[in-house]
């Protein structure tokens, strides 16, 4: 039996989807969840990330290919990561270099390529998360960046499945609002 009570869970992107999943598994422990830019709409490998820019589309298309995709994924480096991630920002100058350095520490670890490709290939709208959304019973706030990768139809579908009254929008923000609009995110969580 969990001793944790009145927990607030905040997640962005895949983390937002995980917040919803945890709330279904442990509703008595969860007071509220905040879902920022939930990444729940892919119909093919890395679709959402590919919406960011041409560079991301080119790289992820090739990473998603059978067999040769492993080679493309193994070539990932700071330059590639930065150019893919910049497609998730309204203002790409807000992508911190030290954060990129931190992410790059994983690139050469054993199993990285396998796990990276596995997450993007399994994380799609057919993985059951949409059905799980209907089971979320805890209070929640759904928030999107004004320039998130999700299309309006994706946002409305998620809102409806979660039975949310509405979703909030952070202006001048892409998919990575935690990094790009820290103050606005903080204010939403504190509200």
Model-derived regions: residue spans:
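Flexible "cap/lid" loop of the alpha/beta hydrolase fold
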Residues: 24, 32-67
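Short beta-strand/loop motif that positions the catalytic acidic residue
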Residues: 136, 142-144
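Acidic catalytic loop of the alpha/beta-hydrolase fold
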Residues: 146-151
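Conserved acidic catalytic loop of the alpha/beta-hydrolase fold
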Residues: 1-7
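Conserved alpha/beta-hydrolase catalytic His-Asp/Glu region
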Residues: 45-48, 70-134
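Catalytic histidine neighborhood in serine/cysteine hydrolases
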Residues: 154-175
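Gly/Ala-rich beta-loop-alpha elbow adjacent to hydrolase catalytic centers
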Residues: 11, 15, 19
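Catalytic histidine-centered segment of alpha/beta-hydrolase-like enzymes
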Residues: 173-186
């Amino acid at each position: 039996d969990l001793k944790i009570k009145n927990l607030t869970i905040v997640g962005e992107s895949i983390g937002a989807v995980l917040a919803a999943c945890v709330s279904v598994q442990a509703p008595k422990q969860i007071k509220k969840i905040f879902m920022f830019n939930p990444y729940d709409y892919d119909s093919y490998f890395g679709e959402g990330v590919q919406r960011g820019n041409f560079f991301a589309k080119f790289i992820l298309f090739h990473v998603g290919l059978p067999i040769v995709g492993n080679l493309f994924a193994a070539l990932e480096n700071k330059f590639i990561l930065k150019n893919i991630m910049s497609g998730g920002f309204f203002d790409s100058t807000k992508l911190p270099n030290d954060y990129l350095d931190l992410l790059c520490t994983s690139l050469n670890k054993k199993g990285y390529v396998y796990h990276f490709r596995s997450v993007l290939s399994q994380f799609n709208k057919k993985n059951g998360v949409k059905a799980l959304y209907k089971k979320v019973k805890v209070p929640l706030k759904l928030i999107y960046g004004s320039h998130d990768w999700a299309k309006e139809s994706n946002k409305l579908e998620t809102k409806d499945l979660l039975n949310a009254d509405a979703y909030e929008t952070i202006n001048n923000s892409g998919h990575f609002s935690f990094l790009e609009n820290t103050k606005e995110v903080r204010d939403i969580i504190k509200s």
